[in-house]
Amino acid sequence: MDILLGVGTLVLVLVIMTLFLKYAPYGKQGLQALSGAACATFLPQAFLSYAIGGVFDIKFLQDIGDLAGSLSGIAVGILTCLNLGVAPVFAVIVGLVLHDFKLLPAFIAAYGVAFLIKWIEKKVPEGLDLIVVILIAPAIAFGLASIITPGVLATLKQIGSAVTAVGDNNPYALAVILGLVIPVTGMTPLSSMVLTSLLGLTGVPMAIGALTCTGSSFVNLILFRKLNIGGPSKAFAVCIEPLT
């Protein structure tokens, strides 16, 4: 039962992300911003704080990595607005107020506010639009993120617990599941780093996912090179992405 629940939750997350990608306005740009923010914050944290700073006990690098990892809300807020065509100054205004929020709630808030800002840019005269955005956008972004954060985090915790339960009961089954899902996710606009961070995979499940990705990423590299899909850079990208 735990295996079915874990597989079902993984599939549900992928289906929701795919539907958002296909049917939501600026869905692809939004997910690219989400993926970019995850890579810009969590990847430096993983390398600097854990892989280098933690292993060699270099506190300076640990502090830098932890700082980068704590700014995911700002990063996703700015990148989401920029990808949706919002002026850079307005994007930074929105991103800064999302400092204390996790990746997904901050993304949802920034995604919604971006459409409001685009409407303001069209309707309000240039120069005055800055004042209007300052008065409206930060408050709405902060309020929206505050409202949805408890529900979003509780849902993600339940999903992550279901996946973790599979690893506790049958690690081989979880290896098969993650070995299939994560590399395939890395070959799409969806990011495997975003997927694993949203699911909250840590400890044994993350280790299982890393082991399976090591083999399947190499297969991706050979497959793309032999089939001449997208050239050498594309083959290298689909190999490296799941390993992040």
Which residue ranges define each predicted feature?
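Pore-lining transmembrane helices
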Residues: D2-T244
